[in-house]
């Protein structure tokens, strides 16, 4: 039998001096009794996995809205891939795998329906940037468990809040691992999905990134992961080598030009934009129809509406739009 205290002691023996130890966590906003068998970061991981927001990720778009194939990524499969890649890196660097896993599993809980399109529409609606990493933190702090939140540790909250490259760097090396692995995962699997959709051809990929990262999906992932591990171990900080970082930037620029802003993706986004805008307008006029945990009564109406609509899955948003705006005989 392996109790929590023994696991915490093992962390001090086995993990790197740079690793974040569960026993040294800065704690939770609301203090809790320790668990018999799970460390604080393990409990956070479990709370995230059992949350409603986590389950909804399976019906939220990654890039392709309502694809016909069964093998395109969703926000949930993306999250799981980030967690797997990040744990591999953390294990090799002797960092805290439990902290990495919790941050990875929670990093996209605040994502809107229809991918980043929903984020842009909510930015226009609110008149200020709607940032999914900030909303992810709001989900775990406020919206889950009917307003109680998940009461996660400071370290997991920090990793969730700072996983995006537009935000300040995370305070822990584990958060830094998730930050890199999020980008690694989405670039590699978005290329894979774009090839499957026929939007790009394999040999259209930029020549330097193709040469440096490899041609196949597995080869690209392996190159990124191995480079992140070896470079970070040598540098004493989480980062890629200059050459692989250049290949990543080149591939990301290509994906924006040829995939994320392609006619095929933008065409479906225009339809989705109308759905989100219509729902925002409707619930602004009818806030009493907002249901469940998505409503904090003390907040302004526009915040209540943003919480509600941003928490919807693609499928639920479309069905709700039909119910509200499409005559029954036309459905």
Model-derived segments and their meaning:
Residues 1-79, 83-89, 95-97, 130-331:
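Histidine-centered, transition-metal-coordinating active-site segments
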């Amino acid at each position: 039998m392996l109790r929590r205290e023994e696991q915490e002691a093992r962390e001090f023996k086995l993990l790197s001096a740079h690793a974040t130890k569960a026993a040294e966590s800065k704690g939770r906003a609301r203090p809790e009794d320790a668990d018999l068998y799970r460390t604080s970061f393990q409990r956070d991981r479990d709370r995230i996995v059992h949350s409603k927001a986590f389950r909804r990720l399976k019906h939220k778009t990654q890039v392709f809205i309502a694809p016909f194939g069964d093998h395109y990524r969703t926000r949930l499969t993306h999250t799981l891939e980030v967690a797997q890649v990040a744990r591999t890196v953390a294990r090799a660097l002797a960092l805290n795998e439990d902290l990495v896993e919790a941050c990875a599993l929670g990093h996209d809980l605040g994502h809107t329906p229809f991918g980043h399109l929903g984020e842009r529409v909510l930015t226009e609606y609110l008149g200020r940037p709607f940032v999914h990493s900030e909303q992810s933190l709001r989900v775990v702090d406020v919206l889950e468990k009917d307003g109680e939140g998940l009461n996660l540790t400071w370290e997991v909250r920090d990793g969730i809040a700072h996983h995006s490259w537009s935000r300040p760097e995370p305070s822990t090396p584990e958060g830094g691992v998730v930050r890199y692995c999020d980008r690694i995962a989405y670039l590699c699997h978005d290329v894979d999905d774009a090839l499957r959709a026929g939007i790009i051809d394999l040999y259209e990929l930029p020549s330097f990134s193709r040469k440096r990262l490899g041609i196949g999906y597995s080869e690209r992932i392996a190159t990124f992961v191995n480079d992140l591990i070896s470079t970070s171990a040598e540098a004493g900080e989480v980062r890629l080598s200059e050459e692989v970082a250049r290949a990543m930037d080149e591939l990301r620029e290509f994906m924006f030009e040829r995939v994320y802003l392609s006619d095929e993706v933008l065409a479906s986004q225009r339809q989705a934009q109308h759905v989100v805008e219509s729902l925002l307008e409707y619930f602004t006029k009818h806030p009493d129809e907002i249901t469940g945990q998505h409503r904090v009564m003390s907040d302004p109406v526009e915040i209540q509406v943003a919480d509600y609509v941003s928490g919807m899955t693609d499928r639920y948003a479309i069905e709700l739009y039909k119910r509200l705006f499409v005559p029954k005989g036309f459905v």
